[in-house]
């Protein structure tokens, strides 16, 4: 119908095409990207149904694995369990940790992940909005994210949505991410 009304041709991308374009845009960061992947780096693409982890070490792609831990899938699990937002952290932590422990044994082995590149709809928006506004740029530390998450636990979903300029209904998905 879009083509009939506007004359614009549209194609729908598959998951793999979308992820390829995401990775390509990350790689276009040039020298900064090349420097980052020299050390242990994981690109974590958080989708609705799954998370894809691509592991780089010494400038080489070591592995890519898909885990069924997407935001919508986990949110559905939380709804099934009638979990409140305050319970999300512990419940999701248990679910994610069980799958990540298998991933670590099979693929991570003795590698150390020094850099994490996140591709998603929620954490990326948080970093762009909150940290850029603070003059901190696109790169954040683990400590900064943990500090923000700790502060956000003290806020209502309405306060948090206003702070981040995001719809309040997106807050559960942000907690899951």
Q: What is each stretch, according to the model?
A:
Residues 41-45:
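Short glycine-aspartate micro-motif
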Residues 47-50:
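Active-site-adjacent helix-turn-beta-strand microarchitecture at beta-sheet edges
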Residues 1-40, 55-177:
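Helical "lid/coupling" subdomains associated with nucleotide-phosphate turnover
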């Amino acid at each position: 119908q879009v083509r009939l009304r506007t004359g614009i041709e549209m194609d729908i991308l598959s998951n793999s095409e979308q992820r390829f374009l995401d990775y390509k845009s990350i790689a276009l960061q040039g020298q900064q990207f090349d420097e980052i992947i020299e050390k242990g780096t994981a690109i974590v693409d958080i989708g609705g149904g799954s998370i894809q982890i691509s592991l780089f070490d010494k400038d080489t792609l070591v592995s890519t694995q898909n885990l069924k831990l997407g935001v919508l899938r986990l949110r559905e699990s939380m709804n099934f369990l009638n979990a409140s937002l305050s319970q999300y952290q512990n419940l999701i932590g248990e679910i994610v940790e069980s799958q990540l422990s298998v991933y670590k044994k099979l693929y991570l082995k003795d590698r150390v992940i020094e850099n994490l590149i996140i591709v998603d709809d929620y954490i990326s928006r948080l970093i762009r909005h909150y940290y850029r506004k603070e003059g901190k740029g696109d790169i954040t530390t683990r400590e900064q994210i943990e500090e923000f998450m700790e502060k956000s636990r003290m806020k209502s979903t309405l306060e948090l949505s206003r702070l981040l300029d995001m719809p309040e209904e997106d807050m559960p998905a942000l907690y899951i991410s």
